[in-house]
Amino acid sequence: MAPGALLVTSQNGRTSPLYDSDGYVPAPAALVVGGEVNYRGYHHAEWWVGNAKQVAQFYITRMGFEPVAHKGLETGSRFFASHVVQNNGVRFVFTSPVRSSARQTLKAAPLADQARLDEMYDHLDKHGDGVKDVAFEVDDVLAVYENAVANGAESVSSPHTDSCDEGDVISAAIKTYGDTTHTFIQRTTYTGPFLPGYRSCTTVDSANKFLPPVNLEAIDHCVGNQDWDEMSDACDFYERCLGFHRFWSVDDKDICTEFSALKSIVMSSPNQVVKMPINEPAHGKKKSQIEEYVDFYNGPGVQHIALRTPNIIEAVSNLRSRGVEFISVPDTYYENMRLRLKAAGMKLEESFDIIQKLNILIDFDEGGYLLQLFTKPLMDRPTVFIEIIQRNNFDGFGAGNFKSLFEAIEREQDLRGNL
């Protein structure tokens, strides 16, 4: 071991070198992690976008986020700018290049920045604005990373420590479906606003002083769309490399309309704090919403992120007041739902009339119910959107709403000429 190598002790009690003077010291190929690694939840989602500052402002003014940290020319980042916004437990990072990808520009960049700049421009050209990375906070980065790589995951960055005056953070990253990545984050002693290298935002955005608040709790789940016959391989990756299990699934018999269909499997971390639904298209008369996404995103990627709220009526009302556009649900859905709720003896705490007025969808079983609503796509490409969700003793994913939801999205698809 090289002098000065950093040692990290994993949950199984094994002390390993994280890196030495020549770089990361890889784990044995046959490594099996002892014990179950604890996933703490989603740490953040990073979006690669054309103009990070403007996109951050959209989430601040439209969705009630607050600016918490940034990185850019002012902090010594010469080629990229990142703006971090947060709403309670929901963190989004928006990153853009601030220099051209022209060769003469790249000559001045370190090799790592050259590669990242090239990748970012390729990503923006291929996908448009989209989610590049979904980051998980874990108790043991070393164990999660080693287990993933030993079971076939492709490394993006090996475990390393970033330090600043506010403490240390250990992180690593792997590839998942398409061009999407997962970063593992372990906040060992860190007390800062986001991650080392970011500067805290000290002022509150003035727009939020004049707009109704939006109370979000956390990222509930993050959905990935796959191309034809790719769902099984994606789910196998989460089982094999990350120790996830199949939590819930529906097939094309359950999610179909007159024109199109899809299949979906929800993958969950062992402790069920992280859930990653995986969709793929199924055969129908016309193009499904999954096919439309894959066509315009040019491959698999994150379709939507569900944000949990304790009060969806207040959240959706205030989001609408701020200018957020949601899908429309026909009155016939609510006529049928009122009868279903009455037949099942299910009583909602919320006013049914207000739920209908706001176009909120309802699903339920004998134990509880779920309220949810979906925004329209957030950019001109019909790709990524946001879900607002409230759970009342209900762990499902709105299977009872899939047909109505699919039909609502198809109406938007038809307006775009993509059905």
UniProtKB/Swiss-Prot annotation:
EC number of this enzyme: 1.13.11.27
Cofactor(s) listed in the protein's UniProt record: Fe cation
Record GO biological process: L-phenylalanine catabolic process; tyrosine catabolic process
One Pfam family matching this protein: Glyoxalase
An annotated Gene Ontology molecular function: metal ion binding
Domain VOC, first and last residues per copy: 41-187, 218-376
Comment on bound cofactor: Binds 1 Fe cation per subunit.
Transmembrane segments annotated in the record for this chain: none
Pathway the protein acts in: Amino-acid degradation; L-phenylalanine degradation; acetoacetate and fumarate from L-phenylalanine: step 3/6
UniProt KW keywords: Dioxygenase, Iron, Metal-binding, Oxidoreductase, Phenylalanine catabolism, Repeat, Tyrosine catabolism
Catalytic reaction equation(s): 3-(4-hydroxyphenyl)pyruvate + O2 = homogentisate + CO2
Enzyme class: oxidoreductase
Chain sites annotated for binding Fe cation: 221, 304, 387
Similarity section: Belongs to the 4HPPD family.
PANTHER family, A to Z: 4-HYDROXYPHENYLPYRUVATE DIOXYGENASE (PTHR11959:SF1)
Name of this chain's protein: 4-hydroxyphenylpyruvate dioxygenase
Species assigned in the record: Zymoseptoria tritici (Speckled leaf blotch fungus)
Gene: HPPD
